[in-house]
Amino acid sequence: MLLVIANAPKDPLARTQGAHLADLPPADFSRRLAGTLPRVLLSAVAVDRVGALVDGFQSLGFAAFSCDPTAAPSDEDRLLVRNIEVEAGAMALLDGQGNHHPCIGASLSLIQRGVRVTTTSETVTTTERRLDVGRAVMTGGLMVTSKAKKQSIETEETREAFLLLQRNDGQPDAVIYERRIDYRFLGADKQPASHANLERTLARLRALAPNAPVDDRVARPGFVTGLPLTSSDPVDLGLYLVTLARTRGL
């Protein structure tokens, strides 16, 4: 289990007591809580111990909760949106097969912004011809070459922004990736750049669901990279932590 801090008091005494409760040096305690909250203070906490730790931190004025990282939803649990249809204030999300999934504005409880980074590695083999001096001497000065194979690993990093539409009507959450959706539904507002189109899509969603807050913590620098390694994808874990914090009004 993870022990998560969603808000921390500024009182130095409370923070000193919090470091003692977590059995951490004060400097390490402060470092783990630096940056955008919520932050994971402790990982791999025993199930029978995490509840007492949450209670202890709450008594010191911290907003704390526990989290099972294996419960974090992934894209396998979400609707991947390929197109959107809007008519008379009603919206339908279309999947890759063209199936319509009705979605009224009131059913959106939260819109999260994020960036998913995908790294791909490929082994590249090249063949070079080199002058074989030894064989050239043996053949009386004839130019003799030999083949040498060289392997290198080429790594490519791809960043793609997305919008996570979280629903409160029992239907699966939906995710809109910047470069995986057909933006023709924007009509005259469609722009040449995908990033600009994603921003216009967000603007339309906010107009349809004015009561749904927009949270960009997962997209902020250092938020996802500051999470501990778990069995869940770091971006999915970050989205889940923000969701849990939001349900607590944080």
Task: Outline where the language-model segments fall.
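Surface-exposed, interaction-prone regions with an acidic/low-complexity signature
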Residues: M1-A8, S59-F65
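Solvent-exposed beta-strand motifs enriched in subsets of small alpha/beta binding domains
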Residues: L2-A8, T36-A46
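Short, surface-exposed beta-strand/loop "edge" segments at domain boundaries and coil↔beta transitions
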Residues: K10-L13, D48-G51, Q97-C103, D169-Y177
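Contiguous mid-protein beta-loop-alpha structural module that forms a pocket-lining wall or clamp
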Residues: L13-R39, G51
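Anionic N-terminal interaction surfaces
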Residues: S43-E85
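Phosphoinositide-dependent membrane-docking surfaces
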Residues: G89-L94, N99-T120
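Mixed-charge, low-complexity intrinsically disordered segments
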Residues: V117-I153
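Extended, charged low-complexity segments
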Residues: T139, V144-L250
